[in-house]
A protein has these predicted regions:
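Membrane-anchoring hydrophobic helices of lipid-metabolizing enzymes
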Residues: 1-98, 103, 133-138, 144
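Soluble catalytic domains of membrane acyltransferases
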Residues: 65-217
Length: 217
């Protein structure tokens, strides 16, 4: 039950934040550089909220192993679905740019509101730990998701297109980009590199781009 899940999350928060102090120096340094105008008390409040969010995310993610499609859809509200379904039909696919926020993993339920023959594509970075990598692939494919490792994104999307498949391509776009393909700009007072893969794929495939805004209530 979700009530038990969030009780466990509260315990996990205490262990992670108070006992283990997981990456606390890194988080505090980032908050100080991003919000120098805020007081120590204000930054501390943000810090604690972040760790509570992180703990909830971890437990909610594991819950996906056993949630039904009905349970997932009951806890997710999708907006502008008519528009992206219409453009998927018209162009053969769209790009959805997704942030690391509000349990983005639950977006795997999008497959339930798409046409059965269309493909929800998830581009991911393979994890070094093979067990965790297989676990996350299992979670992300439960509701028809098609997992593509980032190093073969273009090749796999072109193959799907040639096979006559229409698709929604989900990309986590707020990660630090590897290699030389990146765009630099000032973000939260710091020079920050952004991925440009979504733009490249959109231009190559002539896919419209959606920016996904997530919120948690």
């Amino acid at each position: 039950p979700f009530r038990i899940l969030y009780m466990l999350s509260d315990l996990n928060y205490l262990l992670m934040y108070r006992v283990g102090k997981y990456r606390r120096k890194v988080v505090r340094g980032n908050l100080l550089r991003s919000f120098p105008e805020k007081t120590d008390a204000e930054r501390l409040q943000i810090e604690r909220k972040f760790y509570r969010y992180l703990s909830d995310y971890m437990l909610e993610d594991l819950k996906l192993l056993h949630m039904s499609a009905e349970e997932l859809c009951a806890r997710m509200t999708y907006k502008n679905t008519e528009q992206y379904l219409e453009l998927t039909e018209k162009y053969g696919g769209i790009i959805v740019m997704i942030p690391h926020y509000a349990n983005y993993e639950w977006l795997i339920g999008m497959g339930s509101i798409m046409k059965p023959e269309d493909v929800p594509v998830q581009v991911y970075k393979p994890l070094r730990d093979k067990y965790l990598d297989e676990l996350f692939k299992r979670i992300r494919s439960r509701f028809g998701g098609y997992n593509i490792p980032k190093h073969s994104t273009a090749r796999e999307i072109i193959k799907l297109k040639r096979d006559g498949k229409k698709m929604v391509v989900g990309l986590i776009t707020d990660q630090w980009p590897s290699g030389y393909d990146k765009y630099w700009t000032t973000f939260l007072g710091q020079e920050t590199a952004f991925l440009d893969g979504a733009e490249r794929i959109a231009k190559m495939m002539n896919f419209p781009v959606f920016y996904c805004e997530l919120s948690k209530k």
